[in-house]
Amino acid sequence: MILVARRQDRLAELRHDLQEQHPNLAVQIWQVDLADPAQLQELTEWFDRENLNVDLLINNAGLGDSGPFATSDPIRNEQMTLVNVVALTSLTRHVLPQMIAKRRGGILNISSSAGFLPVPGSAVYAATKGYVTSFSEALRAELHGTGVSVCALCPGPVRTEFQQVAKRPDGRPEIGPEFVLVPLEQVVRDAIKGLEADKPIVIPGFAMKLVMLLARLTPMPLLRLLLRRYSSRDSAESH
């Protein structure tokens, strides 16, 4: 198992926990900031050089932010695009040929329910997740019959460290409505089941599935009106 993340301390802690539970599991860790193109290139070159036999790629790294786009941090926007889009695409490209060659493999891309709709206040984040979902669907079609499966995990709000990092402009954590919140453990279980069942899209939680169904059935003019009202209300609450 190879673990890649920014924080060495968290990587070491996770490796320790995994090896305590699975003593025979070999775990290798790489401290990489995927928002840094040079570090991403170093990682992909290592992948190529070592000719790694990857059976499952989980593209889990992600960045988010909240607030009006006009006052957003350009550097943060670029970092979101680099991590959520560029790194995911690059890593997938580097492991895919050998998966196809051995006619087996799995790719789990962590997208978001935000990727199905434009989200005022999270314009860049939602757009990057829209890319992930579309990319996953297209790749899945290309790989039909190769033995390689592709699944996009599209959760709604989940209680994780992500919400503490992706804060609103007023400093509040970015946590969604209580009724759609799903425990992290359920998200993991649903992701594994979805990948094993070769599902194209996995949306954990009944409430979030219902919300997404209603959103898809809503006529676009009405949806635009609702999005404008949501944006106005959210802006008023943050002042």
Residue ranges: model-predicted function:
Residues 1-13:
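Conserved glycine-rich Rossmann-like NAD(P)H-binding loop of the short-chain dehydrogenase/reductase
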Residues 142-207, 239:
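SDR active-site lid
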Residues 92, 128:
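Active-site helix of classical SDR
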Residues 60-65:
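Conserved NAD(P)H cofactor-binding loop of Rossmann-fold oxidoreductase domains
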Residues 42-45, 68-71, 75-82:
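Active-site Tyr-X3-Lys motif and surrounding loop/helix of classical short-chain dehydrogenase/reductase
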Residues 8-9, 31-42, 74:
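The beta1-alpha1 cofactor-binding region of Rossmann-like NAD(H)/NADP(H)-dependent oxidoreductases
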Residues 112:
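Residue(s) in the substrate-gating loop at a strand-loop-helix junction
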